[in-house]
């Protein structure tokens, strides 16, 4: 009798074990791997399938979501457990769980069944982090600027009857903002910064540029909405004093009427908004926001145009302005801007440096301009070296 029971137990274990002839990989949320800044209450999941058998077809799937990897591994998918869903869908499967929280990291995994009702092993665990799901989640963060917006004037460009309503187009100064704050002497669980800088911004923390993005944020109808970008800065913060820095360019938010241009429009002076949320291991929370406590100064960027390029005057640099020991007593207080667009998380792939070309030689021509020659090899499909 004892042998019969053991045999039955082994047979049962074999029947419920995963079939290793097919598996799930390449998990994405909203078509991105482990994204930060999801601002939808129903993000969509996708995955790819590996199968040894040809013409494999998914018969069913199960997606599980939790707010910690331990809970997920212990089958405590309290955020969402889809159960076994009879479907061959594996692209953009919508989340249908509990209401998601802002600035929260979620963990998810998936497994599938084939047409013989055999189940795969669970996939590896992937993550997604929510952004700020409502304007109210920005807390006390305010839009701040260096200068006031000029009054609205119609007819700056084109004929009066065809003109776009616009701010008066002027040479607004290009600002750099600074905020010093203290991180508590406790272990950080996670920290996210949400930044919108119009027209474009560079974000710095303790002297280093955060992320490898350029020309954030994306263009939009600025009188209706503004994009923000989410950054995971957990590993960049240090205990004690820290310094945030933001530099702004005009982008399409303010197009100056100098040099080459096509669309001539302005929504006002360059401005920015920031919300930083630090969660410590003891679950306590610290918030840093853009408000009147920030300082501002003119940046070394003396001209900025989406059409006409950028002029950077290195003689105007202020060494150390992004560090805690900098003396900012000569900087101005910021202005709080009267601006309240809908805040939308930027989900497009960012602009990034894809290739760098070394300078081979440089010289000063007869006009006093410096000319740089770079090395670049360009091959077409039928050419060889």
Regions found by a protein language model. Give the residues of each.
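Sec-dependent N-terminal signal peptides
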Residues: 4-12
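Recognizes extended acidic, P/S/T-rich segments that occur
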Residues: 58-105, 118, 140-143
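Short amphipathic, basic-aromatic surface patches that mediate peripheral association
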Residues: 49-53
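Activation corresponds to long, low-complexity, non-globular regions
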Residues: 288-373
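Boundary at the C-terminal end of the N-terminal hydrophobic targeting segment
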Residues: 16-18
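Accessory beta-strand-rich segments of carbohydrate-active enzymes
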Residues: 47, 84-93, 105-109, 114-116, ...
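Single conserved hydrophobic/aromatic residue that forms the stacking wall/gate
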Residues: 378-385
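Pro/Thr/Ser/Gly-rich low-complexity, intrinsically disordered linker/stalk tracts
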Residues: 20-48
